Amino acid sequence: MKKTQTWIITCIYLQLLLFNPLVHSQGICRNRVTDDVKDVTKLVANLPKDYMITLKYVPGMDVLPSHCWISEMVEQLSVSLTDLLDKFSNISEGLSNYSIIDKLVKIVDDLVECMEEHSFENVKKSSKSPEPRQFTPEKFFGIFNKSIDAFKDLEIVASTMSECVISSTSSPEKDSRVSVTKPFMLPPVAASSLRNDSSSSNRKASNSIEDSSLQWAAVALPAFFSLVIGFAFGALYWKKKQPNLTRTVENRQINEEDNEISMLQEKEREFQEV
């Protein structure tokens, strides 16, 4: 019985080991993010609301996928946090803020190192350079939190080319002085061209979804088959040991019956002698 239990436990650990790569397949830099990021709320509360922090903002952060901007954005966050750290004293009143920022700098530096180890080779970068901007603590650390959340689910991009260029046809911000005009009607040829471009972009999107599905299947199927094989081996082992266990129980019962018979015979002899 103990051998059977040991085999079952071994099968369970084997399945956990086989599923381990599946669990860690998401978030290539997830283990670099520590619980120190939770102190951001405390830091924002300690800083003046009108305090301005300089950050070179990466264009397209709000409209492009995370793998398009995360590598460059985290480098700029590292620079800004290091500058902010230098403005706080490592003593007395500034100790709390200094300690929090110092921990955040270490996290960001680890993420920069992780991105250097996992570079995105097939990503076409935008020609626009990061733009220096001034942010309040709330907005700055909002960008910081968005970058951290992106790292938690960041994965290596598929081998297909991934466009990371902001469309030049994106509409500029509306000016309040602009008057309302009649809608502009496209000629039939231009409208047809736009429909073709739209269908092409839809095909690209569907292809990217299919690629991600294939990647997931490539990881999940081996783990599933290993699970089935493991349980099959466990069932065969149990079936093989079951007759032995049955014979052991039967032999034990026979021995107990023989012992009872011998005891009764001894008692009869003693009674006859008396």
UniProtKB/Swiss-Prot annotation:
Keywords attached to this entry: Cell adhesion, Cell membrane, Cell projection, Cytoplasm, Cytoskeleton, Disulfide bond, Glycoprotein, Growth factor, Membrane, Pyrrolidone carboxylic acid, Secreted, Signal, Transmembrane, Transmembrane helix
Lineage: Eukaryota, Metazoa, Chordata, Craniata, Vertebrata
Glycan attachment positions: 90, 97, 145, 196
Signal peptide range: 1-25
Disulfide feature: 29-114, 68-164
InterPro entries per UniProt: 4_helix_cytokine-like_core, SCF
Biological role stated in the UniProt entry: Stimulates the proliferation of mast cells. Able to augment the proliferation of both myeloid and lymphoid hematopoietic progenitors in bone marrow culture. Also mediates cell-cell adhesion. Acts synergistically with other cytokines, probably interleukins.
Topology with respect to the bilayer: Single-pass type I membrane protein
Assembly mode: Homodimer, non-covalently linked.
GO cellular component: cytoplasm; cytoskeleton; extracellular region; filopodium; lamellipodium; plasma membrane
Extracellular topological intervals: 26-215
Residues annotated as transmembrane: 216-238
Family (UniProt): Belongs to the SCF family.
Gene name per UniProt: KITLG
Keyword match Cell membrane: yes
Pfam families: SCF (PF02404)
Protein localization: Cytoplasm; Cytoplasm, Cytoskeleton; Cell membrane; Cell projection, Lamellipodium
GO biological processes: cell adhesion; positive regulation of cell population proliferation
Annotated source species: Capra hircus (Goat)
UniProt superkingdom: Eukaryota
One Gene Ontology MF term: growth factor activity
Modified residues (Pyrrolidone carboxylic acid): 26
Parts of the chain on the Cytoplasmic side: 239-274
PTM summary: A soluble form is produced by proteolytic processing of the extracellular domain.
Glycoprotein as UniProt keyword: yes
SUPFAM superfamilies assigned to the protein according to its UniProt record, in alphabetical order: 4-helical cytokines
UniProt protein name: Kit ligand
